From Swiss-Prot:
Official protein name in the record: tRNA pseudouridine synthase B
GO terms for MF: RNA binding; tRNA pseudouridine(55) synthase activity
Catalytic activity entry: uridine(55) in tRNA = pseudouridine(55) in tRNA
EC number from the UniProt entry: 5.4.99.25
Single GO BP term: mRNA pseudouridine synthesis
Function: Responsible for synthesis of pseudouridine from uracil-55 in the psi GC loop of transfer RNAs.
Record InterPro entries: PsdUridine_synth_cat_dom_sf (IPR020103), PsdUridine_synth_N (IPR002501), PUA_sf (IPR036974), tRNA_psdUridine_synth_fam2_C (IPR015225), tRNA_psdUridine_synth_TruB (IPR014780), TruB_C (IPR032819)
Enzyme class: isomerase
UniProt-annotated catalytic positions: 43 (nucleophile)
Keywords: Isomerase, tRNA processing
Length: 387
């Protein structure tokens, strides 16, 4: 299928080790389109749903960013790190160690509180369920991570933190609609190996810990690293994130999403539109003349495709402008005459209560994003050219 000036969405399954911007750069290079953006940053350690818009669909990104999201993650309890994830340095916390020993004695029948103990997972299940239900479900206040992209007086929080400056972020309201414990594994962490799987044996210096696999559905702006930190803090033993995968952004979901929060008839069929990717390396010479090697994101396409063939394959796997608009916000079917009126900046006689995509269904023409003008009329706030 030949594509000339395309607009739409690609649902990228972002691999670990690259930034969201790396994925955007991969799409921009493959499609030869300058106007490309994404709906919500994923950290390099995270994988999963990255909604990337190109062409006129980039004007839908603000709506998509605001959608709720689902993640599957692993929270390690028993230690804290400087960044609240496995990329940070371990923080020695004698109070947390003492609390772990106390819990060990309480949750293990006949346990000795003076020795490192891998606690039985059955005992933890009940404690975690009660703690999550009481403190981390529904509407809560959350302090974002110090190492976050939030700006403070024009500077990113993570830049200030790396410079050793004090970073004070205010709590913000978030909503947790699901926080389910999927699996629990107990074991030991050897030294500074914060990202390694738990060991079964307690070598000298090993720290007892618990890996908790969870599924979390939450409002936009929720920091899963902060939930890991706060769960560990509430239990008194410390906690950080070792794995994070985003499986859903609003109605845009990966095939492995198991949240069940969106009715099947409302969920977009992104199975045939998801494009996987992998991490590779690129070597280049920077402006200082130094040879630098860093990770890059490579989109997975059939072997042998290149140039226009590869571009067209990706576009054939993208959501169309109409599919993108219907997934991004409420949609209203309009007539060709109404589409013409909207493109001239005129109001149409329609009753709506929220920003809505105005679409001519017969021609799949997304004419505009409209909003309420008065009780009986809607007005255009964003107009799209006729494709």
């Amino acid at each position: 299928m030949l594509h000339t000036t395309p607009s739409g969405l690609l649902i990228i399954d972002k691999p670990q080790g690259v930034t969201s911007f790396d994925a955007v750069a991969a799409v921009r290079g493959a499609l030869h389109i300058k106007k490309v953006g994404h709906a919500g940053t994923l950290d390099p350690m995270a994988t999963g749903t990255l909604v990337i818009a190109f062409g006129h669909a980039t004007r839908l990104l603000n709506a998509i960013v605001a959608h709720d999201k689902t993640y599957e993650a692993t929270i390690r309890l028993g230690l804290r790190t400087t960044t609240d994830d496995a990329e940070g340095e371990v923080l020695v916390d004698d109070e947390a160690r003492s609390r772990w020993q106390t819990l060990s004695a309480q949750l293990t029948e006949g346990g000795q509180s003076g020795e490192p103990t891998a606690l039985p997972t059955a005992s933890w299940q009940d404690l975690l369920t009660r703690t999550i239900a009481t403190n981390f479900t529904g509407d809560i206040e959350q302090v974002p991570n110090t190492f976050s992209a939030i700006k403070i007086n024009g500077q990113r929080a993570y830049d200030l933190a790396r410079e050793g400056k004090d970073v004070e972020l205010k709590p913000r309201p978030v909503t947790i609609s699901e926080f389910t414990v999927l699996d629990i594994r107990s074991g030991f962490v050897a030294g500074e190996q914060t990202a390694e799987p738990l060991r079964e044996d307690a070598n000298t210096g090993a720290i007892p810990a618990l890996d908790v696999d969870v599924r979390i559905s939450c409002s936009s702006g929720t920091y899963i690293r902060a939930l890991a930190r706060d769960l560990g803090k509430e239990l008194g033993v410390g906690g950080y994130l070792t794995r994070l995968r985003r499986t859903r952004v609003g109605r845009f979901a990966l095939p492995d999403d198991a949240s069940g929060l969106i009715a099947p008839e409302a969920m977009l069929d992104t199975r045939t539109h998801t494009v996987t990717a992998h991490t590779d390396q690129k070597t280049f010479t920077n402006r200082e003349g130094q040879t630098v090697t860093r990770n890059k994101c490579v989109l997975d396409t059939p072997e042998g495709l290149a140039g226009d063939e590869r571009r067209n394959w990706l576009l054939d796997h993208a959501l169309t402008m109409e599919q993108a608009a219907r997934g991004a916000m409420p949609a209203l079917d309009i007539t060709p005459e109404e589409a013409s009126e909207l493109r001239f900046g005129r109001r149409i006689e329609r009753t709506i209560s929220e920003p809505t995509a105005a679409i001519v269904p017969q021609t799949h023409d997304v004419a505009a994003i409209i909003e309420r003008a008065n009780a009986h009329q809607a007005k255009p706030v964003t107009v799209f050219p006729l494709a």
